[in-house]
Amino acid sequence: MSVKSKQYFNIFIFIISLIFFDQLSKYLVVKYVKLGSVYFSFFENFFRIIHVRNTGILFSIGSNINYSLKKIFFLAMPIFILIFIFSLSLKEKNRIARISLLLIFSGGVGNVIDRLFRPSGVVDFLDFKFYGIFGLDRWPTFNFADSYVVIGMILFLVYDFFIKRKAFNT
């Protein structure tokens, strides 16, 4: 197997593993946790597993938008953006930047799968107490795909601001 083929194979395994874990966790929540109920909580309600559905995007933004517009803005556009991110990740030479783009891609695909096959909305289940910060008693409920996107974005920003700029300035 050539170096390039091995690299693409590793990328494929990484993406499939992340998407599988995301979809498996959502499947288990749908199967075992009644919609709207708390399955269990840890550390005096600091962290809970709860089954909710999100028909909007980040933090339920746009959940009241017309169904046809949702298909365009929450399905078609993300698919085009994901294709773009994936193509960038294949061209990226820096390992941190590539991993961050692949995390964003995998998280996006995980939520697009929900939008395609779960008309009642994306399954969210990770719920944290937020102690009134920004006026929120609890952080908006999310899933592993959301975590991949956020971690990927943070990694990419760290890469862009610290690593890429440092290399550019030397």
Swiss-Prot record:
The active site is at residues 124, 146. It holds the Pfam family Peptidase_A8. Keywords: Aspartyl protease, Cell inner membrane, Cell membrane, Hydrolase, Membrane, Protease, Transmembrane, Transmembrane helix. It is a multi-pass membrane protein. Its EC number is 3.4.23.36. It catalyses: Release of signal peptides from bacterial membrane prolipoproteins. Hydrolyzes -Xaa-Yaa-Zaa-|-(S,diacylglyceryl)Cys-, in which Xaa is hydrophobic (preferably Leu), and Yaa (Ala or Ser) and Zaa (Gly or Ala) have small, neutral side chains. One of its GO terms (biological process) is proteolysis. The chain crosses the membrane at residues 9-29, 72-92, 96-118, 143-163. GO terms for cellular component: plasma membrane. One of its GO terms (molecular function) is aspartic-type endopeptidase activity. It is an enzyme of class 3 (hydrolase). It is found in: Cell inner membrane. It comes from the Bacteria. Pathway: Protein modification; lipoprotein biosynthesis (signal peptide cleavage). This protein specifically catalyzes the removal of signal peptides from prolipoproteins. Belongs to the peptidase A8 family. This is Lipoprotein signal peptidase. It comes from Borreliella afzelii (strain PKo). The lineage of its organism: Bacteria, Pseudomonadati, Spirochaetota, Spirochaetia, Spirochaetales.
